[in-house]
């Protein structure tokens, strides 16, 4: 019975994370969106540094196995991926998340995730699909590393993360099948499973990220409400003040208190 309840709660939590939508007032939604941009700006700069060794490793494999034509095509996609990464870096440096048009910036990030996903995954997938690079553990590591890196960079923008993972996984899976035939199906299925795990993990991080900010916003609103109530109570209480003399008789009553006792 306990195991069934635990499994049921786990499935409910998973469904809640996959179908999560921010149902709060516009002010809180904007606060969360701006915090997303701040988080993305920090993570994307780290992601660019991590991308460098992956790109260098991919170039080494290209020059070791692929022909000149495929090296040229892959270098073209590498330049596109590098351009998008540099564009994103300099935009985030100049961006002020507190004043920027967060909707326009988010749309730009989503578009960048699509272009980056196509470019970054095509660097090795195209020469590998046409037999220029032999299938090895290095190919699988680079493919999985690209998925994990994309989930890390775009994790604070779920739509961008989904597009990147979907495009990258599809291109790599098709290249596995094209290069290895039926033998590549198992590798493609494993890659899809890995991508789903990455997507779920970073969605869970985003879910907790949003819940923390919503809770903090509600706590702030509750504290402000209590402050206003206490202020109102103090103002109302001051209307009923009075003083007493040495004989314990009321003197200097407030206007409201005197009016109530008809002492004026």
Go through each PLM region and give its residues.
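Sensory modules in modular signal-transduction proteins
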Residues: 224-246
């Amino acid at each position: 019975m306990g195991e069934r309840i635990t499994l049921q709660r786990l499935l409910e939590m998973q469904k809640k994370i996959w179908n999560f939508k921010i149902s709060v007032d516009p002010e809180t939604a904007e606060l969360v969106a701006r915090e997303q941009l701040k988080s993305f700006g920090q993570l994307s700069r780290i992601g660019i540094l991590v991308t460098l060794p992956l790109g260098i490793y991919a170039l080494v494999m290209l020059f070791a196995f692929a022909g000149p034509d495929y090296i040229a095509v892959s270098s073209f996609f590498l330049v596109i991926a590098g351009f998008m990464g540099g564009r994103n870096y300099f935009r985030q440096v100049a961006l002020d998340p507190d004043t920027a048009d967060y909707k326009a910036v988010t749309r730009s990030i989503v578009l960048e995730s699509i272009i980056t996903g196509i470019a970054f995954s095509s660097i090795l997938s195209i020469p590998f699909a046409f037999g220029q690079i032999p299938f090895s553990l290095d190919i699988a590591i680079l493919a999985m590393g690209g998925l994990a890196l994309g989930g890390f960079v775009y994790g604070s923008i779920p739509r961008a993360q989904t597009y990147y993972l979907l495009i990258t996984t599809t291109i790599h899976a098709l290249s596995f099948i094209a290069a290895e035939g039926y033998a590549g199906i198992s590798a493609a299925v494993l890659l899809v499973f890995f991508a789903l795990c990455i997507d779920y993990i970073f969605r869970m991080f985003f879910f907790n990220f949003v819940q923390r900010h919503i809770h903090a916003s509600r706590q702030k609103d509750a504290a402000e409400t209590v402050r206003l109530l206490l202020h109102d109570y103090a103002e109302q209480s001051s209307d009923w003040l009075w003083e007493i003399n040495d004989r314990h008789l009321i003197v200097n009553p407030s206007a409201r208190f005197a009016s109530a006792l008809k002492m004026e």
